[in-house]
């Protein structure tokens, strides 16, 4: 038979806006994931901090955030790591009538060992074909400066999708 390598995650984020004039919001998040390629049996992240809405309107967004987070990671080898990391990110979004582009980039160094860091980038382009039909292509990259044994330091995913809007 064919062996498949599974991956999955869930992410929940809460934002509280302090008011339009300040352009700051408080956010808290938690995430759980597994990833056979990266040898992650279970990873749980939780954190909270501030986001600065540098620019935001219907067609343009630029957000910058920085949040300390706790990371629990159990590898498929049974090794368990518990670390505190700083999760800093930049999100950029631009939309035109039939085109959207979004990128969000995270830099996450371990607070006690700064040379152990992760960088991830999630990028998508969305084109309107018809008023109810869109084509989406996305590229996700993850770089780990200290990956587990036999795991590549750079992992990427490329996806194409059709989006129906009713």
Pin down the residues of each PLM region.
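Solvent-exposed loop/turn segments connecting transmembrane beta-strands
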Residues: 1-5, 34-42, 76-82, 110-118, ...
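Membrane-embedded beta-strands of outer-membrane beta-barrel proteins
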Residues: 10-14, 48, 88-90, 121-123, ...
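Repeated loop/turn-to-beta-strand initiation elements of outer-membrane beta-barrel proteins
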Residues: 19-26, 58-62, 93-101, 127, ...
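Hydrophobic, well-structured mid-protein blocks that either form specific transmembrane helices
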Residues: 35-79
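Outer-membrane beta-barrel "beta-signal"
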Residues: 154-166
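Residue-level signature of outer-membrane beta-barrel architecture
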Residues: 16-18, 32, 52-54, 70, ...
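Transmembrane beta-barrel strands of outer-membrane/channel proteins
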Residues: 28-32, 48, 64-70, 103-109, ...
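Transmembrane beta-barrel domains of bacterial outer-membrane proteins
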Residues: 1-13, 28-37, 120-126, 138
């Amino acid at each position: 038979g064919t062996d498949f390598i599974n991956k999955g995650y869930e992410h929940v984020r809460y934002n509280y806006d302090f008011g339009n004039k300040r352009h700051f919001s408080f956010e808290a998040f938690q995430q759980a994931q597994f990833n056979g390629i990266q040898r992650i049996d279970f990873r749980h992240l939780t954190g909270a901090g501030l986001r600065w809405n540098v620019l935001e309107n219907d067609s343009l967004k630029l957000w910058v955030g920085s949040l300390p987070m706790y990371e629990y990671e159990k590898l498929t080898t049974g090794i368990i790591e518990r670390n505190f990391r700083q999760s800093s990110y930049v999100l950029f979004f631009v939309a035109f009538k039939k085109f959207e582009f979004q990128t969000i980039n995270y830099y996450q160094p371990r607070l006690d060992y700064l040379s152990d860091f992760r960088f991830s980038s999630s990028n998508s382009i969305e084109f309107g074909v018809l008023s109810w039909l869109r084509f989406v292509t996305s590229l996700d990259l993850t770089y780990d400066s200290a990956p587990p044994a036999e795991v590549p330091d750079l992992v990427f995913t490329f996806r194409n999708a059709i989006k129906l809007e009713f």
